[in-house]
């Protein structure tokens, strides 16, 4: 009888272990259940979804994840374009091709050198282009990269497509000239790591810093895992 009880206890424990596995990365815990992958970061839990929500997960190779919130009420054209690219799995296996400590880290170029983008350019949503945008370029802000010129032209003001940057340290002098559209709400430690890597004379990291993908997420509202 005792042996039977021992076997039952072991079987129950095994089921519990199989039912919910935990993996630890640099800045998050991955809870694996039978049908869900739950990402816990800074006390919040998120699950991936095919729904185009206003929350996205940036999976950075070796370092962990960032969770960012998008603001369609501030930059509707920019957010719509960003969501469409995510839905097409556009942002898979890109590098952060431009990194400047205390300024920003930039990605989203399929060429990996700052010359490329997606097939469609969008209207620049910022005051220099006649659009109100009150999201400031403070630490953690997501904003669209674009071509520049002196003087600016209609072409350069509306040249953003897929490249974007994450502000490392407050850079409010960019306000009014670039389309800010979101903010990192969890995972700025990953931005700090990338911002401090060695770069060459073109501000490109000596060792590739890889963005594995960007996916939509939503807050996990289930019970205890």
What are these regions (language model features)?
Residues 3-10:
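Sec-dependent signal peptide recognition
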Residues 11-19:
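Hydrophobic h-region of N-terminal signal peptides that target proteins for export
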Residues 19-225:
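Cyclophilin-like peptidyl-prolyl cis-trans isomerases
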């Amino acid at each position: 009888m005792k042996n039977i009880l021992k076997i039952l206890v072991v079987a129950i424990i095994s089921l519990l272990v199989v039912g919910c596995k935990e993996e630890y990365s640099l800045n998050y815990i991955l809870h694996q259940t039978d049908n869900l992958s739950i990402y816990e970061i800074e006390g919040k839990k998120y699950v991936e979804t095919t729904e185009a929500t206003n929350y996205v997960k940036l999976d950075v190779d070796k370092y962990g994840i960032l969770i960012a919130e998008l603001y369609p009420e501030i930059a509707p054209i920019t957010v719509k374009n960003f969501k469409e690219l995510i839905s097409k799995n556009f942002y898979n296996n890109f590098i952060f091709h431009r990194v400047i400590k205390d300024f920003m880290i930039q990605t989203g170029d399929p060429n990996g050198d700052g010359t490329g983008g997606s097939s469609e350019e969008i209207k620049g949503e910022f005051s220099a282009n006649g659009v109100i945008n009150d999201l400031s370029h403070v630490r953690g802000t997501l904003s669209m990269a674009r071509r520049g010129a002196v003087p600016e032209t209609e072409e350069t003001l509306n040249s953003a497509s897929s490249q974007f940057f994450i502000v490392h340290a407050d850079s409010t002098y960019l306000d009014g000239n670039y389309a800010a559209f979101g903010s990192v709400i969890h995972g700025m430690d990953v931005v700090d790591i990338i911002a401090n890597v060695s770069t060459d004379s073109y501000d490109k990291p000596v060792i590739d810093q890889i963005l594995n993908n960007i996916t939509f997420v939503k807050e996990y509202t289930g019970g205890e895992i």
